[in-house]
């Protein structure tokens, strides 16, 4: 298994991305963040659509090669985008075409975040969110009650009126 994501503004079912048939040629799992029974198997629902910032556990008999072009995500105040979160562990991705230093993400979200983990055979903390153009996604623990994660565009100045992270009620 690997953590898999797609870049940009995408809304595409995992079953349309991976070659072959679910359960035979590939498997996709979503982590709902709960303490037990947290991995949900692909069921064709919208939960399993690749969307900006969303990733999955995936395994495939064949390599995954997506030859589509995706529109870039929109920026808030020309500086950042946001991706939705749930409480607990989330599989996230960087929807931009450039890597984003985790220190910039942490600063944009109040500087209380734990670093994300990548998985390439073993889990390891990452100090940079590689672009989802690489197909990579990351595990992130939302233990701060965030409804969304602000991801600043690399090199964009932080503006005084840029949105603050939203806290769950």
Name what the model sees in each region.
Residues 1-167:
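N-terminal exported-region signature
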């Amino acid at each position: 298994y690997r953590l898999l994501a797609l870049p940009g503004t995408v809304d595409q079912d995992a079953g349309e991305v991976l070659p072959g048939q679910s359960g035979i040629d590939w498997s996709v799992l979503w982590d709902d963040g709960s303490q037990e029974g947290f991995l949900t198997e692909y069921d064709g629902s919208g939960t399993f659509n690749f969307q900006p910032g969303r990733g999955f556990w995936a395994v495939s008999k064949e390599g995954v090669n997506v030859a589509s072009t995706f529109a870039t995500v929109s920026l808030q105040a020309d500086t950042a985008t946001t991706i939705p979160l749930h409480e607990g562990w989330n599989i996230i991705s960087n929807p931009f075409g450039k890597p984003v230093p985790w220190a910039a993400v942490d600063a944009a979200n109040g500087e209380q975040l734990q670093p994300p983990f990548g998985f390439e055979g073993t889990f390891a903390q990452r100090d940079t969110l590689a672009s989802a153009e690489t197909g990579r996604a990351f595990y992130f623990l939302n233990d701060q009650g965030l409804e969304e994660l602000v991801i600043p565009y690399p090199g964009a100045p932080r503006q005084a009126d840029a949105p603050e992270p939203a806290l769950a009620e």
